[in-house]
Amino acid sequence: MRLVIQRVSKAAVHIGGVCAGAVGPGLLILAGIEEADTEEDVRWLANKAAAMRIFSDADGKMNLSVREVSGSVLVVSQFTLHASTRKGNRPSFIRAARPERAIPLYELFKKELASLLEGRVESGEFGADMQVSLINDGPVTIFMDSRKRE
């Protein structure tokens, strides 16, 4: 499972012109699931994302987590995080999990985050054509991969 975590002043996801979720301040998390991912991967990343200290403390040092600042989280499914660009110029998404595998793990990720955070957890709709808007704060962008545990 791969995540792109962005610290945001605000973020929103629209589906068909209707706002499906909005947060701020907090995190926008793009989540990509591959076939080999497990519930353990999901739980590890949910715990890391909730505890990652990327918000400033009183001294301006990145020392607080989204949990500690009671921030909100917007989770958006993003199968393209598993794109392979090895051959040619057209990305291959063969490593991305099929919906029947990915949806239960995506739902578990949101549930795990919600159980860890006092702030809101909002989301887009898995597999939908979505428009995501955000205002980066910093910017701070972190990439995580459960396979590499980094």
UniProtKB/Swiss-Prot annotation:
The UniProt entry, under InterPro entries, shows: Daa-tRNA_deacyls_DTD, DTD-like_sf
The catalysed reaction is: glycyl-tRNA(Ala) + H2O = tRNA(Ala) + glycine + H(+); a D-aminoacyl-tRNA + H2O = a tRNA + a D-alpha-amino acid + H(+)
Regarding protein family, the annotation reads: Belongs to the DTD family.
**What is written about domains in the entry's comments?**
A Gly-cisPro motif from one monomer fits into the active site of the other monomer to allow specific chiral rejection of L-amino acids.
Q: Which gene encodes it?
A: dtd
Query: Which function does this protein serve?
Result: An aminoacyl-tRNA editing enzyme that deacylates mischarged D-aminoacyl-tRNAs. Also deacylates mischarged glycyl-tRNA(Ala), protecting cells against glycine mischarging by AlaRS. Acts via tRNA-based rather than protein-based catalysis; rejects L-amino acids rather than detecting D-amino acids in the active site. By recycling D-aminoacyl-tRNA to D-amino acids and free tRNA molecules, this enzyme counteracts the toxicity associated with the formation of D-aminoacyl-tRNA entities in vivo and helps enforce protein L-homochirality.
Q: Which residues form a coiled coil?
A: none
| Keyword Signal listed | no
* Upper lineage: Bacteria, Pseudomonadati, Verrucomicrobiota, Verrucomicrobiia, Verrucomicrobiales
This protein is called what? Answer: D-aminoacyl-tRNA deacylase
| Subcellular location(s) of the protein | Cytoplasm
Superkingdom of this protein's organism = Bacteria
Which of UniProt's keywords are assigned here? Cytoplasm, Hydrolase, RNA-binding, tRNA-binding
- For this protein, what is the EC number? 3.1.1.96
Assembly and partners are described as: Homodimer.
Major site of localization recorded for this protein: cytoplasm
GO MF, any single term: Gly-tRNA(Ala) deacylase activity
Q: Which positions, given as ranges, span the membrane?
A: none
Which EC class, in a word?
A: hydrolase
Instruction: Check the record and name the Pfam families matching this protein.
Output: Tyr_Deacylase (PF02580)
Q: Where is this motif: Gly-cisPro motif, important for rejection of L-amino acids?
A: 138-139
- Record GO biological process: D-amino acid catabolic process
Where is it found, in Gene Ontology cellular component terms? cytoplasm
Q: List the disulfide bonds.
A: none
